[in-house]
Regions:
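Conserved alpha/beta core segments of nucleic-acid transaction machinery
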Residues: 1-19, 83-89
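Short, Lys/Arg-enriched anionic-surface-contact patches
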Residues: 10-36
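Residue-level signal for the short linker/turn that defines the boundary of a DNA-recognition helix
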Residues: 34, 45-49
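DNA major-groove recognition helix of helix-turn-helix
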Residues: 43, 66-67, 73
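Short alpha-helical "recognition helix" segments of helix-turn-helix
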Residues: 50-55
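Short Lys/Arg-enriched helix C-cap and helix-to-coil transition segments
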Residues: 72-92
Length: 92
C-alpha cells in the first residue's frame, strides 16, 4: 500500500513539477490539480480511509476530490492531458 502511494506520488510529482509538500498542502490551482490527480489514481486501488491515512488529508477533502474529479477534468484540458500521461506511466 505504501509502495503504491509513493509510486503514484512520484509520478504525479514528476509530471506536474511539484513536491510532495506542495501537492498535499499548497492552495494554488495547479497544486490543487496535482492533488486531484494523486487522489484520483490512488482511489483506483485504495479505499478512502487508506488514502486519508497515507496523505494526511481529511476524509472530507478526499471524498470531495473523489466525487469532484470528473467535473473538474471535464473543464480542464491540462488536467485531462496530464492524467493520460500519468495513467500511461503507471498502468501502461
Amino acid at each position: 500500500m505504501r509502495d503504491f502511494y509513493e509510486k503514484v506520488l512520484g509520478v504525479v510529482s514528476a509530471h506536474t513539477g511539484f513536491s510532495e509538500h506542495q501537492i498535499l498542502h499548497d492552495r494554488h490551482e495547479m497544486c490543487t490539480d496535482a492533488r486531484y490527480l494523486l487522489v484520483h489514481f490512488l482511489s483506483r486501488h485504495l479505499r478512502c480511509n487508506e488514502i486519508v491515512h497515507l496523505t494526511g488529508l481529511s476524509k472530507q477533502a478526499v471524498s470531495q476530490i473523489c466525487n469532484g474529479y470528473d467535473a473538474r477534468a471535464r473543464f480542464k484540458y491540462s488536467l485531462r492531458s496530464t492524467a493520460k500521461s500519468i495513467e500511461f506511466e503507471l498502468f501502461g
